[in-house]
Amino acid sequence: MNQYPRYSFTNDPLKPATIFLGDHQTPVWIQQRWEEGEYAGFIQKNGCGHCCVAMAARLQGVEIDPYEEFSLCCSMWGIPDLKQQYGYLSVAGIVKIMTHFGIPAVAKDTFRQGTQAAAQDICNALKEGKQVILVSNAKRYKDNPFSPGTHYILAVGYTEDGRILIANSTIRAKDLAVQFADYDMLEQALIADGGANPTLTWGEPAIQPENFGYVIVG
């Protein structure tokens, strides 16, 4: 039987919430408040995917933070060109990092199956006790509560009262750190032409849609 995710709030501006799932837990990091290390600027500007990977990994039992995760990416693929690659991850890059830790992960696109089928696939995965890292965008979703721009969020699972618990790393969200969603919200938030090109690692703006499907973890 799958366990329901729980959460609590803290007084730490960098980690204002903690999420609990079974025997594991993770802080919800706020990327704009990360200040440590030489890559802090990357994390502040484009660290949503790195925060999501670190949070999902911790819920799978791998102790890592966004800085350690970003450093691992740099050791595997080189330091990204901030003007060209921005330092954000493609969904294929997320899978490569999860695989490095021995965590099952599958990248999927939205453009072939459509956003309705993709949202249902995400909901089904959450019901199975998996987590999903997905790209949210305000283009299709007026007043998107997750972020006014393109942004990775982590869908943790269904709560006991039937809501989808979202871990959100940006101060630009309407509710800081912890949010709730349902099928309709996810369907509106998904990028309609999101891809899952398996050859990508860092995101490439020139082929941006190929970066932005979603990843099922676990």
Task: List PLM regions with ranges.
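Active-site-adjacent structural segments surrounding the nucleophilic cysteine of cysteine proteases
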Residues: 1-88
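Mixed-charge, low-complexity intrinsically disordered regions
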Residues: 12, 91, 217-218
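Noncatalytic regulatory segments and standalone regulatory/sensor domains
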Residues: 18, 45, 146, 158-218
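Solvent-exposed, acidic/flexible segments
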Residues: 41-50, 87, 91, 115, ...
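Extracytoplasmic/secreted envelope proteins and their assembly/folding machinery
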Residues: 49-57, 91, 95-98, 119, ...
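Cysteine-dependent hydrolase recognition
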Residues: 55, 59-85, 107, 189-209, ...
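Mid-length scaffold segments of soluble, non-membrane domains
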Residues: 79-83, 87-111
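Active-site-adjacent substructure of cysteine-protease-like catalytic cores
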Residues: 114-171, 175
